[in-house]
Amino acid sequence: MESLNILISNDDGVFAEGIRALARSALKKGHKVTVVCPDQERSATGHGLTLQSPLRVERADELFEPGIKAWGCSGTPADCVKLALSELLDKKPDLILSGVNHGPNLGTDIFCSGTVAAAMEGTLENVPSMAISVASFKWKNFEFASEIAMNIAEQAIKDNWPNALLLNLNIPPCEKNKIKELSWTRLSIRKYKNQFSKREDPRGDDYYWLAGEAVLDLKSKGYGPKNWPSDVSQIEENKISLTPVETDLFWRGSLDVLPKINASFINAS
């Protein structure tokens, strides 16, 4: 296919193995690659934007293959994509890729994911965007994950990529010959037991460290067509999960089940 202008970001930071593998894979396929990503890890920042302090950027070409332009940014993943589109790029990209994330982005976890937020920022600007994650914090075959991501992205660009569609790709942590299939999936509902570790700093003041433990994964529930497999069940079966996500969060249920709100208080004397 024709060479694409591709913007790549992430939430693991400019030194992460995943983003370098993804940029390398895109370059090998003949595409023009620009990287704008956080200058350090900013996982689980959601779609946060930096409003109370300046954004600073520094060139980081030396961390990537020759021919790749790269910047490390002091902001969030969403900041990085917004800044790239507004200031750093000469022209609007044909494709935005976010990842490869070190760990899964499944189910309702996407609401706090910086990886997904970077792709969502591109989607909001009508640029075809995909978030890519390896569903393990220990598995390091990012080259394989990047190869899968590029093949999917190129096919989607060539065929039909609707406006407002974000593709959320999760790859199981296993070798190529162990992967069974790729399927469209729906989002699961994942819930956590929030565990705060209370500690004391050298000055005697308390502080808290958050670590979430997944205690409930409602694979049978969630969003999307019920005859589609859930993203979590797909990964558990060593299958690639590709979930279509859109920007529209509007309630799709019946008006009859919404709370009854009496607005008489508005004009009350």
UniProtKB/Swiss-Prot annotation:
A divalent metal cation binds at D11, D12, S43, N101. The keyword tRNA-binding does not apply. Keywords: Cytoplasm, Hydrolase, Metal-binding, Nucleotide-binding. InterPro entries: SurE, SurE-like_Pase/nucleotidase, SurE-like_sf. It is found in: Cytoplasm. The keyword Repressor does not apply. GO terms for cellular component: cytoplasm. It catalyses: a ribonucleoside 5'-phosphate + H2O = a ribonucleoside + phosphate. One of its GO terms (molecular function) is 5'-nucleotidase activity. Its cofactor is a divalent metal cation. It comes from the Bacteria. Binds 1 divalent metal cation per subunit. Its main location: cytoplasm. Gene3D superfamilies: Survival protein SurE-like phosphatase/nucleotidase (3.40.1210.10). Its EC number is 3.1.3.5. Nucleotidase that shows phosphatase activity on nucleoside 5'-monophosphates. Belongs to the SurE nucleotidase family. NCBIfam families: PRK00346.1-4, PRK00346.2-2, surE. PANTHER family: 5'-NUCLEOTIDASE SURE, 5'_3'-NUCLEOTIDASE SURE. This is 5'-nucleotidase SurE. It comes from Prochlorococcus marinus (strain MIT 9515). The lineage of its organism: Bacteria, Bacillati, Cyanobacteriota, Cyanophyceae, Synechococcales.
